[in-house]
Amino acid sequence: MTYDLICVGAGPTGLACAMEAKRAGLRPLVVDKGCLCNSLFHYPANMLFFTTAEKMEIGGLPMAISADKPTRVEALKYYRKATEHYDLDLRLFETVEGLERANGAFRVRTRRENGAREEHHATRVIIASGYYDLPRPLGVPGESLPHVSHYFTEAHPFWRRQVVVIGAGNSAAEAALELFRAGACVTLVHRGERVKRTVKYWVLPDIENRIAAGEVKAEFNTLVTRIEPGQVVLRSTNGAAAAERLLPADFVFALTGYNPDFAFLRAQGIELDPQTQKPAVNPETLETNVPGLYVAGVVVGGQHTSEIFIENGRFHGKQIIASLH
């Protein structure tokens, strides 16, 4: 079977692309190496989204919730129901290993979770693979130790433990607060001089007040130079000759952001800007330099992952499908 298009990624953007395709009378296939909305599933268990429900809706379907902003659980339920409504053709837990284009169509090579290889064919492909799978590495010794993670899920296991949170954005601030409220001894470490101003408006004063009260410790203008069992090694950014010092750490959360899979994009022949890693696209159609190959969602922004969210990436499907007529 040859599909009209294959969407690589079953997050909100990939689903929105497939829904727009079905509304236009096309036959789409959605492929994802994880579960439906895999990134959202791996968000912190108690996460509350920054944006309101109507700005997360896809396929023209309302998100009916009791509060203004959806929780992670409510968002996952909505996207399941929306997918069922459109009866999308999905291949979950199936990894895309590569694409080949010949005679005006694509051959998409995949590997299922049992190791079996498959091929799917389509006249067009949309890469909407997100970015949450690839943390931005600190690049310091000890980063791969078992007590270090780039993902925070919930705080309970860390009650009365010494926890270091590296970063000062939304993820780091929310993790630090949740850990503090669960009884952990938390220290926030950030190379900048303060918590980022882009932190959610209801979280920012909370974390700043906890720091001011000494309930969450903070090491600003500070770098982690290496991680060791039971401790991290810190160095101040104020002066090249600053002495290193030790900070106890039973667990370390390095919440310093994530990147799209640039290597995968390059492997498909997509040209990336050497500075920003933004893919070369037609801004009107989101078609890349490879004919018939499109990008959607946060992938469009390259390293500037804060430019595109669910609330604006969800419209990329309309933009792409409209260009096909």
Predicted regions and their residues:
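Beta1/beta-strand and adjacent pyrophosphate-binding region of the FAD-binding site
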Residues: 1-13, 161-169
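Active-site acidic short loop of glycosyltransferases
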Residues: 2-3, 121-123, 160, 229, ...
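Beta1-alpha1 glycine-rich phosphate/pyrophosphate-binding loop at the start
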Residues: 3, 10-88, 173-201, 273-275
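Glycine-rich, N-terminal phosphate-binding loop of Rossmann-like dinucleotide-binding domains
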Residues: 10, 129-130, 256-257
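A Rossmann-like FAD-binding core segment of flavoenzymes
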Residues: 87-122, 181-276
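Predominantly flavin-linked oxidoreductase catalytic cores and closely associated redox partners
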Residues: 101-104, 115-188, 192-203
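FAD-site-proximal beta/loop scaffold in flavoenzymes
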Residues: 143-157, 258-307
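A conserved FAD-binding loop/helix module that cradles the flavin
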Residues: 296-325
